[in-house]
Every structure is written in structure tokens, then in C-alpha cells.
A protein has these predicted regions:
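Conserved, mostly hydrophobic/aromatic
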Residues: 28, 36, 52, 71, ...
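Conserved SAM/AdoMet-binding glycine-rich loop
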Residues: 60-162
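Conserved C-terminal portion of the radical SAM core fold
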Residues: 128, 151-196
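Canonical Radical SAM [4Fe-4S] cluster-binding loop centered on the CxxxCxxC motif
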Residues: 9-51
Length: 196
């Protein structure tokens, strides 16, 4: 459920099916992954806080029973920490039954946040981050223009868990293709094991 007139398609994880979708950004700041068509038609932009506040206010008036909010689009953690804290607080203030806020977060965006920033976001009520590992094989990550490395992904995942977040990771099983199936499977398992 959402109240929004912004351009582009809305995407969310399956587990956020009954969440209020709050599009704090439009599109994806990276948006070069060859396997992902989700935000190709949207030019990335961060919405002004006043606009986001208005969406939260309209959403709370229309859906006062909301228990979960999902901050969209492709990588909400690209926002300044103080802006995210404001958004999370406003959600908890206006949705009295709210139990959890979640967001997509790229490994790079998680890694850019300090441990203190991540802890503050979690303490404010951001409970789950959805991140795309895709592959643990650097050759595959380079080929698909993911914009990260296995090392950075491990570091980001460890930082998120240390801050107290639940971490939901996406892995694309066939991304290695026939030529890198073994390396893709092996290195992806290593990354997941190293994170947790």
C-alpha cells in the first residue's frame, strides 16, 4: 500500500507485501547492474524531506493500522543519516501500531555509514535491511557492473549485523553463467559464511 504520485514502478521484497511503501528516493543511485531492469526508466533522485513528511502524514491518515513501513526505492541508505532518523521517527510517531521499518541498502551504502550511524538507525527502529549480494565472485560482480566486491559486501554485512539489523540478502543463482558456475557458487557461499 502506498500513497504516491511519483514516476516509475514500485518494487519491494515479498516479505513487505503488507507494508506501507514510502518512496524516500526515486530509482537507484547505482542503476548500472546488467541483470536489474527495476529502475532503468527512473532518473535517481532524493525526495525533499517536506515531501516525504507529507506522504507519511497522508499515509497515516489513510492507513492508521499500518504495522510495517518499507522505505523505498533502490537504496534508502544513500540518504543522510539525520534525514533517515527524521523519517523513521516520523513514521513511529504517526503510525501508532508500527512494529518495524525496513529498507533496501546496497553494500556500498551500508559500508559508507559509520558503526555509530548504523547503531542509531537501528535504535530508532530501522529493523531490517535488504541487500543484494548477488554473487561472491569478484569476476562475476565486475562483469555485471555491481559496483562492489566480495570484500566490501562482507564488511558491509558484518557492520549491519553488528549494529543489530536483521539482514536479508539476495543471491542470483545463475549469475555466474556456465563458465563461472563453480566459482560463483563457491565464493558466494564463502561471502555468506563470512558475514555470519
Amino acid at each position: 500500500m502506498y500513497i504516491d504520485d511519483a514516476e516509475g514502478m514500485v518494487f519491494r521484497p515479498p516479505s513487505e507485501a503488507y507494508s506501507f511503501i514510502l518512496r524516500a528516493t526515486i530509482g537507484c543511485s547505482h542503476n548500472t547492474c546488467t541483470f536489474c531492469p527495476m529502475y532503468k526508466e527512473s532518473r535517481f533522485r532524493i525526495r525533499p524531506l517536506a515531501e516525504i513528511d507529507g506522504i507519511i502524514e497522508r499515509g497515516a491518515a489513510a492507513y492508521p493500522y499500518v504495522r510495517r513501513v518499507f522505505i523505498a526505492d533502490g537504496d534508502a541508505l544513500v540518504l543522510k543519516t539525520e534525514d533517515l532518523l527524521h523519517i523513521i521517527k516520523k513514521c513511529y510517531d504517526l503510525f501508532p501500531r508500527l512494529t518495524r521499518v525496513g529498507a533496501y541498502a546496497t553494500p556500498a551504502d551500508i559500508d559508507r555509514k559509520t558503526p555509530e550511524e548504523l547503531a542509531a538507525l537501528h535504535e530508532a527502529g530501522l529493523g531490517i535491511l535488504y541487500t543484494g549480494i548477488e554473487s561472491g565472485d569478484d569476476a562475476v560482480l565486475t562483469r555485471v557492473h555491481k559496483g562492489t566486491t566480495a570484500e566490501l559486501t562482507v564488511r558491509a554485512g558484518q557492520k549491519a549485523l553488528a549494529a543489530g539489523f536483521k539482514l536479508s540478502a539476495m543471491i542470483l543463482l545463475g549469475l555466474g553463467g556456465q563458465e563461472r558456475t563453480h566459482e560463483h557458487a563457491l565464493h558466494t557461499a564463502e561471502v555468506v559464511s563470512a558475514i555470519n
